């Protein structure tokens, strides 16, 4: 019993020491963190269970770029192009600067008018009718400030007037008139350019919320839809698309957010649009396409983004307008097509924008375009996935053979008739 108690007490002491050591020890053992690329290459069975990571957008759905510039040291470059800097500011800051510039100039010249009157002694001879002041009826800073506003805005109430006995006042009047015209031209020009910017015109250029992948003319195609809500059209409209996807070169260089072109009809002229009604933009997935080896099962695993850019000239103003949108993998529907929105009414065509974003499911192979091409080459038949079309094609081939060799067909039919007669006998 004594040995058992001694052993138990020793065990408790050791456990207590180990617990105290765990609590009081300032050293924490952390699992080494691998680089991002190495973590992505880990097998699934040893990777941690975590929720599906959301793809970070490069361009948002409304067309704004999701990029913030940090640690910009050469901020003086913004001042060298002060006009563009003011135009790019938000409206609240633009209006604040507009009011502040005019207020500061009025106060500045009002202070100078008051100093001239004070130095000349006009303030001491306000009630003296024989004294000729620089500016009549200027009896303080408030009246000098009001005279500055009247001078710069050319209001001219006639109550305060500069006299010819004040040459310094005449020079100041010329300077304020010239500087006031420059301030008016600069600030009014900024406001006019900001109001007439074609950014708001892009609000009426809409893109479908989803892109689709389906068969078109026997080829796998990526498609999305664009439309213009206004009756005044976009002149010289053109569309282009970019694939944003990180890549690693054969030399091991990692290129984040690499941009590559997606052909939407550049060589055929289909990228130049007559955007009167909604159009479906199609990208044929061929060997030059970045989607050549992507199948339906592999598409959700890809970390990519498709940026579409629609450019054109605004018919009303003649200014260039650009609208942008993007699609990530979760917004690309495999095996779907867009619902038609154009119908013919009595004497005109009507567009139903309620169905602009709607899609419907269609029969589409889940294989990649590369696998489909390999199957087609192996079978030595055109890529087609309709049984009826195959039967029709076979019937057409037989008809062509009959038209080419009618004599052989007659002899073949005669031989068949003789065999039937012999069998009857």
Curated annotation (Swiss-Prot):
Residues the record marks as site: Role in the control of polyamine-mediated channel gating and in the blocking by intracellular magnesium: 184
Reported regulation of activity: Activated by phosphatidylinositol 4,5 biphosphate (PtdIns(4,5)P2).
One term of GO molecular function: G-protein activated inward rectifier potassium channel activity
InterPro entries attached to this UniProt entry: Ig_E-set (IPR014756), IRK_C (IPR041647), K_chnl_inward-rec_Kir (IPR016449), K_chnl_inward-rec_Kir3.2 (IPR003275), K_chnl_inward-rec_Kir_cyto (IPR013518), Kir_TM (IPR040445)
Pfam families: IRK, IRK_C
Residues spanned by motif Selectivity filter: 154-159
GO cellular component labels: inward rectifier potassium channel complex; membrane; parallel fiber to Purkinje cell synapse; postsynapse; presynapse; presynaptic membrane
Main location group: membrane
Extent of motif PDZ-binding: 422-425
Intramembrane region residues: 141-152, 153-159
Cytoplasmic side: 1-91, 191-425
Membrane-topology annotation of the record: Multi-pass membrane protein
Annotated GO biological process: negative regulation of insulin secretion
Disease tied to this entry: Defects in Kcnj6 are the cause of the weaver (wv) phenotype. Homozygous animals suffer from severe ataxia that is obvious by about the second postnatal week. The cerebellum of these animals is drastically reduced in size due to depletion of the major cell type of cerebellum, the granule cell neuron. Heterozygous animals are not ataxic but have an intermediate number of surviving granule cells. Male homozygotes are sterile, because of complete failure of sperm production. Both hetero- and homozygous animals undergo sporadic tonic-clonic seizures.
Family note: Belongs to the inward rectifier-type potassium channel (TC 1.A.2.1) family. KCNJ6 subfamily.
Quaternary organization: Associates with KCNJ3/GIRK1to form a G-protein-activated heteromultimer pore-forming unit. Associates with KCNJ5/GRIK4 to form a G-protein-activated heteromultimer pore-forming unit. The resulting inward current is much larger. Interacts (via PDZ-binding motif) with SNX27 (via PDZ domain); the interaction is required when endocytosed to prevent degradation in lysosomes and promote recycling to the plasma membrane.
Name of the protein in question: G protein-activated inward rectifier potassium channel 2
Organism of origin: Mus musculus
């Amino acid at each position: 019993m004594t040995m058992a108690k001694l052993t138990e007490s020793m065990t408790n002491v050791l456990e207590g020491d180990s617990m105290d050591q765990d609590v009081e020890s300032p050293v924490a053992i952390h699992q080494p963190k691998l680089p991002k690329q190495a973590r992505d290459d880990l097998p699934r069975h040893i990777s941690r269970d975590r929720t599906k990571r959301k793809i970070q957008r490069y361009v948002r759905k409304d067309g704004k770029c999701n990029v913030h510039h940090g640690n910009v040291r050469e901020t003086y470059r913004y001042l060298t192009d002060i006009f563009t800097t003011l135009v790019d500011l938000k409206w609240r800051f633009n209006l604040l600067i507009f009011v502040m510039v005019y207020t500061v100039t009025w106060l500045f010249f009002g202070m100078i008018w008051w100093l001239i009157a004070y130095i000349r002694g006009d303030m001491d001879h306000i009630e003296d009718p024989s004294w000729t002041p620089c500016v009549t009826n200027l009896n303080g800073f408030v009246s000098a400030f009001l005279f500055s506003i009247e001078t710069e805005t050319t209001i001219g109430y006639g109550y305060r007037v500069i006299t010819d006995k004040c040459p310094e006042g005449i020079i100041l009047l010329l300077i304020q008139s010239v500087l006031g015209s420059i301030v008016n031209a600069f600030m009014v020009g900024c406001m006019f350019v900001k109001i007439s910017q074609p950014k708001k015109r892009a609000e009426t250029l809409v893109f479908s919320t989803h892109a689709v992948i389906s068969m078109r003319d026997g080829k796998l195609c990526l498609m999305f839809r664009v439309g213009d809500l206004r009756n005044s059209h976009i002149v010289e409209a053109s569309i282009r698309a970019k694939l944003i996807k990180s890549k690693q070169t054969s030399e091991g260089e990692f290129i984040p957010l690499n941009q590559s072109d997606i052909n939407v009809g550049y060589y055929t002229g289909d990228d130049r649009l007559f955007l009167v009604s909604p159009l479906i933009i199609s990208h044929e997935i061929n060997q030059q396409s970045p989607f050549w080896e992507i199948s339906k099962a592999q598409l959700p695993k890809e970390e990519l983004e498709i940026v579409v850019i629609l450019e054109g000239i605004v018919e009303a103003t003649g200014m260039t307008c650009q609208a942008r949108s993007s699609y990530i993998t979760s917004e690309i529907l495999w095996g779907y097509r867009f619902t038609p929105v154009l119908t013919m009414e009595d004497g005109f065509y009507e567009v139903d924008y309620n169905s602009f974003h709607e899609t419907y499911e269609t029969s589409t192979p889940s294989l990649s375009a590369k696998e489909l091409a390999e199957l087609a080459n192996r079978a030595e038949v055109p890529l087609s996935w309709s049984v009826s079309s195959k039967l029709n094609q076979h019937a057409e081939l037989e008809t062509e053979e009959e038209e080419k060799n009618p004599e052989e067909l007659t002899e073949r039919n005669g031989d068949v008739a003789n065999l039937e007669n012999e069998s009857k006998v």
